[in-house]
């Protein structure tokens, strides 16, 4: 199973994003592939928060357009909704304690714990996720997941 970070959705949605065409093609292929693609509502809400924000984008995405994008993702053939389960908090707490996590590392630890709990490979352009022990992660165009 794959679980994508918010940056993948942003880069596949906003044409001015780095490597937009490649990210869009990657996401389209992944969402229609054979491997289950985990969708976290928390990650999608982060996508909505960022792409509709006029402080982030001069011309932010209209909310209806952003919500339609989310609906397309949620109803894709490979999409599987992922929510924190019974072990999530324990994994999250252990990651936070082990790393002395604070500030902006906390939400990343929360997502890493979700991926670890369901055994997903976390797809992100943020190499900072390498800090989380037990997390399999990779960049979208890499084929070999790293285990850190």
Language model: regions and residue ranges:
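Active-site neighborhoods of divalent-metal-dependent phosphate/nucleic-acid chemistry enzymes
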Residues: 78-123
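Short, hydrophobic secondary-structure boundary micro-motifs
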Residues: 39-40, 60, 81-84, 141
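Acidic, PIN/NYN-like endoribonuclease modules and their adjacent C-terminal/linker elements
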Residues: 1, 112-148
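Alpha-helix capping/helix-boundary segments
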Residues: 8, 43, 87-88, 110-111, ...
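Short, well-structured N-terminal submotif of metal-dependent ribonuclease cores
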Residues: 1-39, 55-68, 118, 146-147
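Short beta-strand segments at enzyme active-site cores
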Residues: 38-41, 125
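Short, hinge-like loop/turn segments at secondary-structure boundaries
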Residues: 54-57, 99-100, 140-143
